[in-house]
């Protein structure tokens, strides 16, 4: 009986440790600021912050970028310091895609490579 109690105690301690590590990892992942990109419908593209406002300036650092591609005729591509024409969604893709990006100081452009006039810019300080 005593050995079963010891095994149970070890299992409970191990489970608590796993839960703690899982919570810490989840907290780290959710700590990144979020950006929301949208391409389509039609010839529209946008990038908004967590408050829903158009991004014109950001602080350098890591961000979670969630792109909602609403048209299979476009792609969402990001270009700037340290990010060379990173295609986040392709023309055959419709739906959400989440990536982590590290933004350095400078000027960035987000655009559709198929329709380059579907384009906007922002600065990172």
Regions found by a protein language model. Give the residues of each.
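Bacterial N-terminal signal peptides
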Residues: 9-17
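Bacterial N-terminal signal peptides that target proteins for export
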Residues: 1-9
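Short beta-strand segments of immunoglobulin-like
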Residues: 51-57
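C-terminal segment of classical bacterial N-terminal signal peptides
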Residues: 16-24
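Beta-strand signatures of extracellular beta-sandwich domains
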Residues: 66, 75-79
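Structural beta-strand segments of beta-rich domains
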Residues: 61-65
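Extracellular/periplasmic metallocenter environments
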Residues: 25-50, 73-74, 90-125
